Amino acid sequence: SDPNEMGDNLPTVNLGTGRTVLAVASSDYHDCAILDDKSVKCWGDGGTGVRNDLMPGGDLILGNGPGEMGDNLPAVNLGTGRTAKAIAVGGTSSCAILDNGSVKCWGGNSSGQLGQGNIISRGDTAEAGHEMGDGLPAVNLGKGRKAKAIATNGETVCAILDNGALKCWGDNAYGQLGLGATGNREIGRAHV
């Protein structure tokens, strides 16, 4: 990029009037931020968890047109009363650790990276509304388990649990789940 476009010449990302950012995660296709009110806003292509009703046909790309950012950019619906503690994004999927320690993932799901026991994408279509919020199940981390940290490359997700254990799910073509074998884990529960 042109050095004259950086520094004071580089505009800030407008995420809403008076909003500040606590955490941010970035992928090749989209970005997500946890705001000072613990809500999540995502923009870019895929993994945003919201439909862009500002464009004809509900374009899923947010942030590339006038009037799409700031107060017009909706927060991701994580469920009634739920807020985010941590966010991870990769490719066209996103995962958040919620205030209660549960994990919810949305977006593309070609390798089972959403942890729902299938390869059905969620929150990435014009019908995203019913797939999000209370309609988006939390990932089954095990009885009573909560997540402390989360990371994803877009196809594989790993979470550090409250007991210090690590669970990973999704793409395993190269053994990246650490299970001593290959083959994706598309089942509804995470594996160690």
Where are these regions (language model features)?
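Short glycine/serine- and acidic-residue-enriched loop/turn motifs that recur at repeat junctions
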Residues: 1-6, 41-70, 107-132, 170-189
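Thr-biased low-complexity repeat/linker tracts and other Thr-enriched repetitive architectures
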Residues: 1-6, 12, 17-20, 35-39, ...
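Conserved positions at the start
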Residues: 21, 28-31, 84, 91-94, ...
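Short loop/turn segments that connect beta-strands within the blades of beta-propeller domains
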Residues: 27-28, 36, 90-91, 99, ...
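Conserved core positions of repeat-based scaffolds
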Residues: 30-33, 42, 93-96, 105, ...
